[in-house]
From Swiss-Prot:
It is an enzyme of class 2 (transferase). Residues 114-124, 148-162, 171-197, 230-245 have a biased composition (Basic and acidic residues). Glycans are attached at N82, N214, N237, N254, N255, N438, N454. Residues 114-247 are annotated as: Disordered. Expressed in roots, hypocotyls, cotyledons, leaves, stems and sepals. It is a single-pass type II membrane protein. The gene is GT11. This is Probable xyloglucan galactosyltransferase GT11. Functions in xyloglucan synthesis by adding side chains to the xylosylated glucan backbone. Involved in the galactosylation of hemicellulose xyloglucan. Residues 35-720 are lumenal. It holds the Pfam family Exostosin_GT47. GO terms for molecular function: glycosyltransferase activity. GO terms for biological process: protein glycosylation.
Length: 720
């Protein structure tokens, strides 16, 4: 009985709880539906089509006087029926305007303000766009550029340009302009109108006026700079000699005070040939680096350091990260013939090696006014390697064009218009001479850019028909750090026993009709006991192992060096390093290339056999070499061994005091650059109109013999 009462009691309580929960749910449902309806009404009021045809008198009159009426803005393009909106037109605004209508009017006011601001921004952007377009002239936009990383440099350049433009507003320039022809008078009626414009608009109009009427002169500069170079600042070059143009005239009419112009003029003198400092600043008479100082540009990292950081992108088939390690020397190799300092060096890493050697150069200066030459630490070969086999030629040119723009805007460039600058490329010159009319051809256009043609370019192979390209030795496997290592290796080469008369390491070139490699390999096979042949056929790994290659050269008295895909071979320097006398078949393989590093008397260190005689079967290589007297062979070998230091690159960490009296290929190349720049400087100071007084196709002849008279080698260098 007690249990039944207890059960009935709990049942009654349960129903109470259930009923209360149900009532609470109904209340919440009602509140939710009411809130949703309110939100829906507000959303409908905020729709654009529901706020368009509102009467003007219901909008608070708190706009600025110069703003346009709201009804003109919102009713131009859209017409929507707003009859369903709860708006009362006849009721007084202060008494009958609903809360929703106030929200709508506030929104309309906000939209109107936003429209006015956008209109002002649009007008400003159009004016600025026209001004920038006028400054660019007719230059076509570049398809690919690395502008993001050069943004800081661009801002600096704009400030420099502004200073240089203001410099031309000095009183002296005013007087010079008064003597100019009357082609400026066409703009006199425009000047009073410009005086009425505010300062900002005056600056914009001045920029437009100083560039747009100057199309003819800017076209000349752009044509000289290969059309797709950015040459809007080409007038700052050292060669500027044309009369002043409309650009300077308009600037002289602005409201800048003459006193300010005089101060700026003294601080930034215009770059004219007569006033430019061609010679470096004098130092003390007993300065050991006098005339040898070199300044190294601090170019943006994307032109060198970032290429090494992203080394995995340089080649699809080769691990360039490994090959660019150890200052560009590559992986360390075991000692050879008891001498240390051997590395698996790739022939295309010369740029990295040279850069690291320059960091240790004894006459490197941070003061560009002392420098006799300026080094540009750009890695053009590695940069090109990334896109060499790609389908987009413009990507091969992008970084080079950006660098040229950066150089043109530097103060060091303006001193001699870049003629005291030099750069190193670890590839042959043919990789950098793609012509504009053949965009799909191999390589890029670096060597034909106007700026580079003013510079001195160091490559592992130069063109015989080029003013500014000079060849330097290929990197070898030996990079000693001390004087003792050099002497030890030379002594080892003098004592070594050489079993074979001559040897050849290479592959045939059946696709090249004028190649003599097949004939050479046939003659070597015929001289079984006197010739050693290492045929680099497909799949053979011996030709890629430094120790195997050096063993071949160490066992031979003469090493054959016929041309391959190009005139030169890295094998030439590997064989000389091994004390093997080189045998050349074309003067372009060494004699007309490495004019700074090899002796003028070619018979002292090499043998020359005309390739035509080999091709036609008129000569036996074995007979020619066997007839050389033994005493002469010893003398030639001694000369080759003495050449070894000049044809290799010391370890970049080595100091000049560590290597003693020896000069390596780097030292010889820098001396050659300094001598060439000094010659150009003298010709400029003498007022020579032409820097070179001989045709460019005879460059090889002038560099080798000092004249362009007829020579027996002329048939070898007939232009193709």
């Amino acid at each position: 009985m007690a249990m039944e009462k207890s059960s009935s009691k709990y049942r009654t309580q349960f129903w109470y709880v259930a009923m209360a929960s149900f009532l609470l749910w109904l209340v919440l449902l009602y509140l939710f539906s009411s809130s949703a309806k309110t939100v829906h009404n507000h959303e409908r009021l905020f729709r654009q089509e529901n706020i368009i045809d509102l009467p003007v008198e219901n909008v608070p009159q708190n706009h600025e006087p110069d703003e346009a009426p709201v009804v003109n803005v919102v009713s131009e393009d859209i017409s929507v029926d707003n009859s369903s909106l709860p708006v009362s037109v006849d009721s007084p605004p202060d008494d009958q305007m609903s809360e929703d209508k106030k929200v709508v009017t506030d929104l309309v006011e906000e939209l109107e303000k936003e429209r006015v601001e956008n209109e002002k921004k649009r007008v400003d952007s159009v004016v600025i766009g026209r001004s920038s377009k006028a400054r660019r002239g007719h230059r076509e936009p570049r398809k690919a550029r690395s502008s993001g990383r050069l943004e800081a440099e661009k801002k600096r350049v704009r400030r420099n340009d502004a200073d240089e433009s203001n410099a031309e507003n000095s009183d002296e320039n005013h007087q010079a302009l008064d003597k100019e022809p009357n082609f400026f008078e066409a703009k006199k009626d425009v000047e009073p109108k410009k005086a009425l414009v505010d300062d900002n608009d005056d600056d914009l109009e001045t920029k437009r006026g100083k560039e747009l009427p100057n199309d003819s002169s800017s076209n000349v500069v752009e044509d000289d700079n290969d059309d797709d170079l950015e040459t809007k600042k080409g007038k700052d070059n050292i060669s500027k000699s044309e009369p002043k143009t409309q650009r300077n005239f308009v600037l002289n009419k602005n409201n800048t005070s003459k006193a300010k112009n005089r101060v700026i003029s003294k601080r930034n003198q215009p770059s004219r040939v007569g006033k430019v400092m061609l010679r470096p600043r004098e130092t003390r008479s007993n300065d050991p680096c006098k005339g040898k100082y070199v300044y190294m540009h601090e170019v943006p990292a994307l032109f060198n350091e970032e290429l090494l950081k992203n080394c995995w992108t340089l080649s699809r088939w080769t691990d360039m990260c490994e090959l660019t390690s150890n200052f560009g020397l590559g992986p360390r190799l075991p000692n050879m013939e008891g001498v240390s300092g051997w590395y698996a060096t790739n022939q295309f890493t010369l740029e990295v090696i040279f850069h690291n050697r320059m960091k240790q150069y004894k006459c490197l200066t941070k003061d560009s006014s002392l420098a006799s030459a300026v080094y540009v630490p750009y890695y053009p070969g590695l940069d090109l390697m990334r896109f060499l086999w790609g389908p987009f030629p413009f990507m091969r040119d992008a970084a080079a064009l950006d660098l040229m723009k950066w150089l043109r805007e530097s103060q060091e460039w303006k001193r001699m218009d870049g003629r005291d600058h030099f750069m190193v490329a670890g590839r042959t010159t043919w990789d950098f001479m793609r012509t504009p009319e053949n965009e799909s051809d191999w390589g890029n256009r670096l060597m034909i850019l106007p700026e580079v043609r003013n510079m001195t370019m160091l490559l592992i192979e130069s063109s015989p028909w080029n003013y500014h390209g000079f060849a330097v030795p290929y990197p070898t496997y030996f990079h000693p750090s001390t004087y003792a290592e050099i002497i030890q290796w030379q002594m080892r080469m003098r004592r070594i026993n050489r079993r074979y008369l001559f040897s050849f390491v290479g592959a045939p070139r059946p696709n090249l009709g004028d190649s003599i490699r097949t004939e050479i390999m046939d003659q070597c096979k015929a001289s079984k006991r006197k010739c050693k042949l290492l045929e680099c056929i497909s799949g053979s790994q011996k030709c890629y192992k430094p120790d195997q290659i050096m063993k071949f050269f160490l066992s031979s008295t003469f090493c054959l060096q016929p041309p391959g895909d190009s005139y030169t071979r890295r094998s030439t320097f590997d064989s000389i390093l091994a004390g093997c006398i080189p045998v050349f078949f074309h003067p372009g393989s060494a004699y007309a290339q490495y004019i700074w590093h090899l002796p003028k008397d070619i018979a002292k260190y090499s043998v020359f056999i005309p390739e035509k005689n080999v091709k036609e079967g008129k000569v036996s290589i074995e007979n020619v070499l066997s007839r050389i007297p033994r005493t002469k062979v010893f003398a030639m070998r001694e000369q080759v061994i003495r050449l070894i230091p000049r044809l290799m690159y010391f370890h970049p960490s080595s100091k000049s005091e560590d290597t003693g009296r020896f000069e390596d290929a780097f030292d010889v190349a820098v001396e050659g650059v300094l001598e060439r720049v000094e010659g150009l400087r003298k010709r400029i100071e003498e007022g020579k109109e032409e820097i070179f007084d001989f045709p460019e196709q005879y460059s090889w002849k002038y560099n080798v013999f000092g004249n362009v008279e007829r020579h027996e080698w002329d048939p070898y260098f007939d232009r193709p």
